[in-house]
Amino acid sequence: MKHTAQDILNYVEDNDVKFVRLAFCDIFGNQKNISVFAGDLPYAFEQGVCFDGSSIAGFMNTEESDLVLWPDPDTMTILPWRPTEGRVMRMYCDITLPNGRPFAGNSRGYLQSVVKRAKAMGLRCDVGCECEFYLFQTDEHGNPTRIPMDHGGYFDIAPLDKAENIRREICFAMEDMGLRPQHSHHESGFGQNEVDFMYSTALKSADNLNTFKSTVKAIADRNGLFASFMPKPMQDQAGSGMHVNVSIHRDGKNLFQGDIAPDSEAGHFIAGILAHARELTCFCNPIPNSYTRFGSCEAPKYVSWSRQNRSQLVRLPSATGEFCRLELRSPDPSCNPYLVIGLILAAGLDGIEKEMPLPAPVNRNLFHKSAAEGLESLPESLREAITIAAQSDFIAKQLPVPLMNKYFEYQTQLCHGYESAPDPQAWERENCFLKI
């Protein structure tokens, strides 16, 4: 159901809303917001809300700093962990320059442009993300430690699983915010958890993922815990992935239903993702820590596909009807979902447009090194991934030059900081663990 600005204003008046958070992401996926009083919301809808873009990572230079937020009424939700009297609403925003032109660094806008391109090709793309996270204890000052909340394992129950009530609270909050939880369970690592929610349109799924991450962080904090979405917060435990599930539809039909021929549109779509997988990696896996996850605990390392096989980069899960889809297993939760979902879809659409043939499936366990002979591997480090993406004609055609340059510049700084740090673990804690 579409909402108008007037719908939101009526809701604010009827439901004791006092504050409205106008939320957006920097180009690296970190959520930001500015709060306005509910009485100022009509002005925000009509004139936008100006802010200093030079203070947001990857946005603007000081000499050209003004940007404008425009709230999207369709993203309205009430934050259930905030007070019930004087309630707090949140909406995601689009971003423009003061003259009304789209801002090139708005990654949400990039995803919207890819969705429009798919629509022009007669396609609808649905997306669902599976996001894992860790829960850690905090010290007497409330600062995060590296001590996991529990020592449970995959699908364990209490008393080994001590996060059951946290996941329950997360699921109820998600439901209150319009997300539909599907599954929740303890994951493989000590203190590791997963909560899955229903797929949706590409843009809504990216919005939902940001909502999910902020919800997990807030509820963990309320319970005296710290939630980490870092890909590999403990080297002796499983990494956290963010598997991206995609289905494409033409004339109401899911193209992943039934057998997928190498020369079918679904086959071309998968082929496009495989062809551009290495170029996408610095976006799917954007920090140095991301690369310690590859090749273990069901995290892929090679460019390949198969049905069901969890050692593959792309797999086709066993499903029927509307749930037939592909699953890309390389992304991790530190990524910007707008960029990643947009680039995944763009790669698949490129495969369709160029009629790329689908390679033969690889039906081997690629966690055994000998089984991977002859296969192309994903980049082994962030620096290698940046080099590949920076030389990619595909990436250059996809992303606005200012966004791309800022992104690579920031990642190169991350590489230098990590590689030159006297204590890489201490550097990682300050620059990644505490922020992701």
PLM region spans:
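Glycine-rich, acidic/polar active-site loops that bind/position phosphate-bearing ligands
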Residues: M1-I436
